[in-house]
Amino acid sequence: MENSLKSSGKPPAAPKVGMVSLGCPKALVDSEQIITQLRAEGYEISGTYDGADLVVVNTCGFIDEAVQESLDAIGEALAENGKVIVTGCLGAKKSASGSGLIEEVHPKVLAVTGPHAVGEVMQVVHSHLPKPHDPFVDLVPAAGIKLTPRHYAYLKISEGCNHRCSFCIIPSMRGDLVSRPVAEVMLEAENLFKAGVKELLVISQDTSAYGVDVKYRTGFWNGRPLKTRMTELVGALGELAAQYGAWVRLHYVYPYPHVDEIIPMMAQGPLKGHVLPYLDVPFQHAHPDVLKRMKRPANAEKVLERVQRWREICPDLTIRSTFIAGFPGETEAQFETLLDFIREAELDRVGCFAYSPVEGASANELDGALPDDVREARRARFMEVAEEVSAARIERKVGKTLKVLIDEVNEEGGIGRTAADAPEIDGVVYVEPAAKASKRYKVGDFVSVKITGADGHDLWGEV
């Protein structure tokens, strides 16, 4: 029998999946892993709703505003495309009736999973949009698909958290701490550096607790033993970064005793300039009574002593932190204690939230809830003090020559960051255009910049 079907000579078009990623850097890494797996299996990634065969929405459910943003994004994806898979923290949230919140608000979604559920997401994708073919080994780069610029990337070392802070519901959505195998983390870091990443941002819910869940089990990397522990991991990442002339930046660092072991790496020896003198430490408050209600470590005096000791060892250390103003039961005197702490600690970069009740958080049961206007007024007063402190510290950099990583180049010059500035949350350096061809720079370059001015948050300088 003659076959009447003739080949067009072109392979069938690959199915396309759209991706909407909301929330924190940890959620962004989840999205990157999903996209990486999709590309590995031959799917294409669509940048538009109408160009996609279905859409995956990675949600955030930490605070009420984030919940609403996620629900709105799901609704938009349903309206524009119609086929939507939902993943992320909001997927683990229940409504007042006890059923899934997303399914109750948007019953037409194809499926809902919780956070860090790449396998589950892929199973649902397969059931609604079969994968086109078995992938070639080199279809996706070893570093995976990233949503960040090529010169920096986030490295997530664990999932979940063992803390039970009264204002937070993350453990109920992401579970208890689960540390990634240390060799797996190191391999990902190496692949990222090989791909041209100049700055690796180490993230998790609690970076300092890395390895606690596996009792600091010893793994192996490049034929040598390596403990699944923060200190050893940071040292190994610093050594790897030094080979590629890159930076390692630490986020979500709780001030456990062994953090003291990290500071010398930042200040001296072969890792100086690679393990950045930068710590993102979420202190949240300074008054012991408020910290106890938050179910947080409650000794601000010891924290001040350690901050001072860290700076004695590493004078260039930048400390970023976040705080909550207007927590239930917070008195004016307790708030003043917080302001005094900010002045004395001289933190470089600070963020502050007016307390907002989060559905499911135990803090909702505390007495002494403050009116919205009081909470917001305290947040504003806090930021006024914090910005004065930050501006004074930034002003000291004028006249110095600093190493800057270029993030953007335009007609007016470049925009970059120093070791003291994490992307998107800290300040930037506006760099004058290079006058000589020998001094021209591009995105991802490290350049030496003489700082000529400061405005309280950002810096200006010339190559």
UniProtKB/Swiss-Prot annotation:
Binding locations of [4Fe-4S] cluster 1: C24, C60, C89
Domain MTTase N-terminal, chain residue ranges per copy: 15-130
Alphabetical keyword list: 4Fe-4S, Cytoplasm, Iron, Iron-sulfur, Metal-binding, S-adenosyl-L-methionine, Transferase
Cofactor: [4Fe-4S] cluster
Source organism: Burkholderia thailandensis (strain ATCC 700388 / DSM 13276 / CCUG 48851 / CIP 106301 / E264)
Record-annotated Radical SAM core domain positions: 147-392
Cofactor binding, per record: Binds 2 [4Fe-4S] clusters. One cluster is coordinated with 3 cysteines and an exchangeable S-adenosyl-L-methionine.
Enzyme class: transferase
Family annotation (CDD domains): Radical_SAM (cd01335)
Protein name stated in the entry: Ribosomal protein uS12 methylthiotransferase RimO
GO terms under biological process: tRNA modification
Keyword check for Hydrolase: no
Pfam families: Radical_SAM (PF04055), TRAM_2 (PF18693), UPF0004 (PF00919)
Molecular function as annotated in GO: 4 iron, 4 sulfur cluster binding; aspartic acid methylthiotransferase activity; metal ion binding; protein methylthiotransferase activity
SUPFAM superfamilies per the UniProt record, alphabetical: Radical SAM enzymes
